[in-house]
Amino acid sequence: ISIFFFAGTVTFTPFFNTFFLSVQDYVMTNLDGAGFIGLENFKNLLHDATFIKAAKNSIVWTVANVGLQAFFGLVVALLLNMRFKGRGLFRALMFTPWAVGGMLVALIWSFMFNESVGVVGDVLNKLGIVDGKMSWFSNGTSAMWAMIIANTWRGIPFFAISILSSLQTISTDIYESASVDGAGAWTKFWKITLPLIKDTLLMTILLRTIWTLNVVDIIYSMTSGGP
């Protein structure tokens, strides 16, 4: 009971305090002049250009990050669940990015996206996708995608290890029975694998959504909050 009381106190007290302040005309330089104004602050917020832009960026950032991490994490988990020589080594190497701190991830990818010596721009040039040097951090769109790529690289291992642990609980007898019935690889995935890992996948998506919304280190280290 004491644990629930403590958790409730540290969770709900700040929430209600914040809501109480949000419905008042609260000015830091005039603490005694606060007065109740209802939902006026929320109305003003919805017409604030900076807030709207920040909200849009947050949605793009979260959806792109979680979507890419979920897709590639699932692919990696399926590959690592197969039997092949050196699987243990590949698993260890695959999970390395998750152990790297956000500041170091930002440093690595900032160097890779560097206009002069970055390997990303060089590869895109050789593939004919871009012509000449590309300054990734000179505009908001390319800077956003540079950060998304960096954070996706860091987050894929978490999806992979979560999904892989769920895949390993599925009995091979189910797949063998499906093969006897003539089911192909695609049918097995949609009818057996995906339904059985659905709960794990949804929980992982929920966790990564919360964590992605709270990412600060990569964003600030790569762009200092801009452009």
Language model features with spans:
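A structural signal for multi-pass alpha-helical bundles of membrane permease subunits
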Residues: 1-227
